Amino acid sequence: MRIQGIQKLTLLDYPGRTACTVFLSGCNFRCPFCHNAPLLTAADEDGMDEDELLAFLKKRQGLLDGVAVTGGEPLLRPELPQLLEKIKALGYVIKLDTNGAFPEQLEAVVRAGLADYVAMDIKNSPARYAETAGVPELALTPIFRSVSFLLRATVDYEFRTTAVAELHDDASFLKLGDWLAGAKRYYVQCFEPRETVLQAGLHAPSEMQLHCWAELVRPKIPAVEIRGI
């Protein structure tokens, strides 16, 4: 399995852990605000091979305690469970980032004990989900299933929404609060414009707006926080 990149140290990507972040290529979404756009279609021959990653992790035993696996969409990769098993065998805890579009794979990974923390991106309220994911006619049933699974599961998790001025409004967050009511934790993340973003001309909401949106959600999800300001 090819690994498209690795951030050798992060204190942010895995809450409460000293971790590295592993980037996998390929994604079924085309979110206009995606900051990892180069990973969407990266060639398999790019990056490092799996053995190189595992050798790095062996050397970092005792220095790192967690591995965050992100993309792209990691659950697109059929070889992912085998990679997670090998990382687990080295004694690491694993955080898995996902867009929730593959609930069967998500459930299998969690039930096998191959993910200790799941971070699921919630793009928007259902009415604007397809637009925000960049996929016309997107079927939402798999997304609903993944949300329902995490709300019931014993695995640690978070939901998070990257807030973009052109894509989100008060109604978005009122609906999100209803949908995700009772969630363990929820983050409103501030969009960061970068040159690699898929769609030019998008803007970050103001800090005041982010706080307003967080407060709209709080009655249904008390553990709501803002990231990126």
Pin down the residues of each PLM region.
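Short, charged low-complexity linear segments at domain edges
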Residues: 1-17
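Canonical Radical SAM [4Fe-4S] cluster-binding loop centered on the CxxxCxxC motif
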Residues: 14-48
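Short beta-strand segments
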Residues: 25, 70, 121
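Glycine-rich, highly charged phosphate/nucleotide-binding loops
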Residues: 46-56
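Low-complexity, intrinsically disordered Gly/Pro/Thr-rich segments
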Residues: 207-216
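Acidic carboxylate-rich catalytic motifs and surrounding loops in phosphoryl-/glycosyl-chemistry enzymes
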Residues: 224-229
